[in-house]
């Protein structure tokens, strides 16, 4: 999965929940591992730091644009 800054990703939901959309704002390196800072499209005030390997899991996230 090619992740770049300002990409929009969506959680894959197997239940009847609406999927959430996130925007990648920046990439960080922590202890030699690359992490992405993502924000919810509807709430850009809160940020989450997620390991890049989690975002590359095609069972959890997919790239929208």
Language model features with spans:
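Short aromatic-glycine-enriched beta-strand elements
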Residues: 32-37
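Short beta-strand-centered aromatic/proline hotspots
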Residues: 18-28
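Short coil-to-beta transition motif at edge beta-strands of beta-rich domains
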Residues: 1-17
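Intrinsically disordered, low-complexity, charged/polar segments
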Residues: 41-65
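A generic structural motif
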Residues: 26-31, 42
């Amino acid at each position: 999965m090619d992740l770049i800054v300002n990409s929009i990703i969506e959680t894959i939901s197997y239940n009847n929940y609406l999927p959430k959309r996130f925007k990648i704002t920046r990439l960080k390196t922590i202890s030699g591992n690359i992490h992405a800072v993502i924000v919810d499209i509807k709430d850009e005030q809160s940020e989450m730091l997620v390991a890049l390997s989690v975002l590359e899991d095609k069972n959890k996230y997919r790239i929208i644009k």
